[in-house]
Amino acid sequence: MSCFLGPSTNNKSRENEGSSMAAPYEQQNLPRNDRRQITTWEAVGTNKESPKNIKAKSFKFRELATATNSFRQEFLIGEGGFGRVYKGKMEKTGQVVAVKQLDRNGLQGNREFLVEIFRLSLLHHPNLANLIGYCLDGDQRLLVHEFMPLGSLEDHLLDVVVGQQPLDWNSRIRIALGAAKGLEYLHEKANPPVIYRDFKSSNILLNVDFDAKLSDFGLAKLGSVGDTQNVSSRVVGTYGYCAPEYHKTGQLTVKSDVYSFGVVLLELITGKRVIDTTRPCHEQNLVTWAQPIFREPNRFPELADPLLQGEFPEKSLNQAVAIAAMCLQEEPIVRPLISDVVTALSFMSTETGSPSGLTGTALNPLSPKTVEDQGWLQCESPRDVYSLL
């Protein structure tokens, strides 16, 4: 279950859920117009990680214990690879918050923890869950985040209960766009840049307006950014969402996140969980099931969530499937950059007619073109869309 959630339909810990970790964005993957020197987070934190230099508020443990009624079970709203998350209400301000109590096994030292808090406190974007504060008290390590009353995308898409209103098509595209913008910030605008590493539907939180906010980014020590590739000592992502090259070799790049985004977009299109052993054998892995359909564009409508009851523009469905198919390509080099995905989804979410006025890059990582030049978003039929993949 994701962190910082509102009431969830399923609070039990999920199998195969790895720690939600972030890693540095390799220098070789910086945008062509931004080959700036980047440093490790540890270097960024040097001489700055003292509490007085951290923008996030420092809380006493007793304050957070009071806010959560001593971390009672009824206040528990989520569990993940890093610990438990409780809903709380600050006694002094009345602010409702989400308190993440980190697992005390393998605790970092005080300095390492403060370096990470300093790093997290520098990340600000409308599509990231805000870090309000932290607690470093004895062996206790806690993070305080804004509370997200609607829970996670998973709650509204994959754990729909009887009588619950399913997400409509426009909301799904809007959520996809918000999540993509959050990733774009981490990849291309944060300094130093960050790879999410465990992007999934349970880590996409929703506020009262159904705006997407990413959670659980950057909660682990980061490796060297000088290497040509970031090779993790162990793969820690969630099965089904991990890019194949990361799962096989531990090699991590921004394109690993793009693959994971493609999985979530496919979940948004289909309403199906990426791994579900209750489905027929050939459908248990969502990506494996969808790949043959990607090759037969006339079958694209088969991917649509039955709960949508056909209430979606066919052209928009075709475009969304095209984006997902590109993100889910086996070879990382031919996947798009997340900024190209943002361009495409922005166009989809605002389209009112002819797309000829759109400027920017199209979804083609090998030979960037304008949307007008490549034309893939202008296609009317599934076959036309797929011919441009």
From Swiss-Prot:
The modification Phosphotyrosine is found at Y246. GO terms for biological process: defense response. Residues 71-348 form the Protein kinase domain. ATP binds at I77, G78, E79, G80, G81, F82, G83, R84, V85, K100. It comes from the Eukaryota. The modification Phosphothreonine is found at T238. One of its GO terms (molecular function) is protein serine kinase activity. The active site is at D198. The modification Phosphoserine is found at S202, S232. The keyword DNA-binding does not apply. It catalyses: L-seryl-[protein] + ATP = O-phospho-L-seryl-[protein] + ADP + H(+); L-threonyl-[protein] + ATP = O-phospho-L-threonyl-[protein] + ADP + H(+). May be involved in plant defense signaling. This is Probable serine/threonine-protein kinase PBL24. The lineage of its organism: Eukaryota, Viridiplantae, Streptophyta, Embryophyta, Tracheophyta. The gene is PBL24.
